[in-house]
Amino acid sequence: ALSVVYPTEEDTAVYGPLAQMDYETWNKWVEFVGKKGGYGSDLAANGTVKNQEELDNIIGKYAYGYNVVAGRVNYRDEIKLANGGAAGGYVGSMQTGTITNGQAYQAKTIKGLRCAGGFAGEMINGGAAKLGGVDILGLNLQLGQMLQVLNVFVPVIKKSSVEGYQSGLIVQSEGVDNKNICGYAGGYVGKLIGGQIWGENDARCKVTKLRRVDGRSYVGGFVGSSRPGSVATLNPTAGEGLLSQLLNKLLSTPADLIKVLNATVATIRYADVEAWDDWGIIVNGAYASGSNNTSYAKAAGGFAGNLEGTVLGKKDTEKAGVSVQNIRSVVAGEYAGGCFGVADVAGVANISAGNETSLLDKLLKLGRTDVLDAFRSYVYYGTVSGSKDAGL
């Protein structure tokens, strides 16, 4: 029943205005609309064309990319409003589903209050605890069924990329609040919780022609913040707490719990960040505050601002690694790095927000130190290069 409502998209793309215009349609427009003056008269002055190449040369002078803006300017902690303020070049907020070979071209400026990303504003393994009239938390599921339920709520992006406009893609998340809910910005995705981003050797997940990323909490050239789906420090108002509730049912069976935890780890493979120009990419966490002082985001990195329980690349598979090219500068208040600002495990120690059950303590008392692997972050075959013009 869950799979019935599982959204999937394959082989789709987003373009800026005038892109993909074919020359036959162009000629008809010139003949019946453009030559009569008024709207588009400067375009129509080019006249009809004989082939697609001629048209592409004309449109290349006028194609101006597209902007995405999530318009809310103030955050409000209410169910109807908590999910607003997420902007992405392809998708704003992705709470489940799979996107395969989705492409975004000519993205110019992506701006959101809570989070912004060149491809996706946020990827969250969320969804309602009650779906289709079935109370998932009340079901008596075997482990295999439980894993299937978890997978339904894990968002996956495969072989999908975003290409910036010719003058470079700018990603901005300038919301400020006192709970670190706003201000997540990444060249590809702003906020990632338990999601999977998987490219392939011949179809990597890339953000190209990136110029700058600005955020006020966590900022990264590829991802602002990446965390596992088992974290307890989620925002239940925004529907982020389902997996923690499911995992809480398994606290008494550590062996099963470890398998489920591994299913919630965020993974990014075959992923790249490329600059718009040799001038390089700026990852910026500095901003002017109301008191005319300079304030800073907590963490920023050339690839990721914050990593928790995340695996970048793939063990023993060099080509599955991640790369950042042409980073010019990375600025943050507490943590800044060429690859990542901070990689931490603290956020996943408590799984039950109600009574603060310490999952880590419970498992360590049982001698299950192997569970620590589900909490650590790993980087396999990651590379960073500075700006060709000015270095890093």
Put a short name on every predicted segment:
Residues A1-L392:
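Surface-exposed loop/turn motifs in large extracellular/passenger domains
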